[in-house]
């Protein structure tokens, strides 16, 4: 079992295992079963994107812009290397660079025997890593509290940044950032504008924006006493899915065949499914400059539909629609 393998390699002591919840009942929709029906495919694609996407506030969906560096802590040897390689390989399949060590991890995966306790300690030690201070860069205090206290087998937290595509600079004020002299002249105070981002608006449009949403760092905490009998391949693919996109941890995905259902029904999927790959490909292939979340969701759904409309359907699983 993977849990035994990881606990043996970890630097922490194991605890009593926690039972997994019962799998959700009902038929499962496979992407391969709906590609022959254009309207059904488009509707299902939009429903899947709506369910799993977790953008910050009213901002668009974030993604990694150029590359990722994957770090794995509290695991040793082949287990850690496999997970790092798997996440990096999926990133490369999406057109990103998968940096090799030594590099500063932008995706940090930590295994522990007590996910909640470790999350609390990490947040208390470096709160600025989770809430850096710039507007619209994280899901906020309520979501962070859920991340801290969750009893999930795997929990994750992402920080994103609105970025000016012309300059590559943050489009929001960062904590401690100053673009002016930053030194109060005699008798006067430093202008408040010195602490605001300086961007030049090159166009005004209700449909498009010159700003994109970049993922900057993602923390993934694996509670090894809660992962049950999942395989290393399943765990690696699950982590890749939640680390390379902003995924809603409370998404209701029971009607879809997706790796996100792993801990509800471990035997149902062996790795990234058609839906998972289609979502990631749609996210990274769709145009970044759309203003509204709705238009971005539709763009990703359309990308999924266009990509898979001509695919040949596989044999349906028992009970699938």
Region locations from a protein language model:
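Sec-dependent N-terminal signal peptides
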Residues: 2-12
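Long, low-complexity intrinsically disordered segments that are proline/alanine-rich
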Residues: 13-25
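A domain-level signal for the mature, folded cores of soluble proteins
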Residues: 18-19, 60, 64, 100
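N-terminal secretion/transport leader regions
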Residues: 25-40
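Acidic/histidine-rich, surface-exposed loop or edge segments in extracytoplasmic proteins
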Residues: 29-32, 60-75
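Compositionally biased P/S/T/G-rich terminal and signal peptide-adjacent segments
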Residues: 40-64
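Long, folded non-catalytic interaction modules
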Residues: 71-86, 91, 95-317
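Terminal low-complexity/disordered tails
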Residues: 320-321
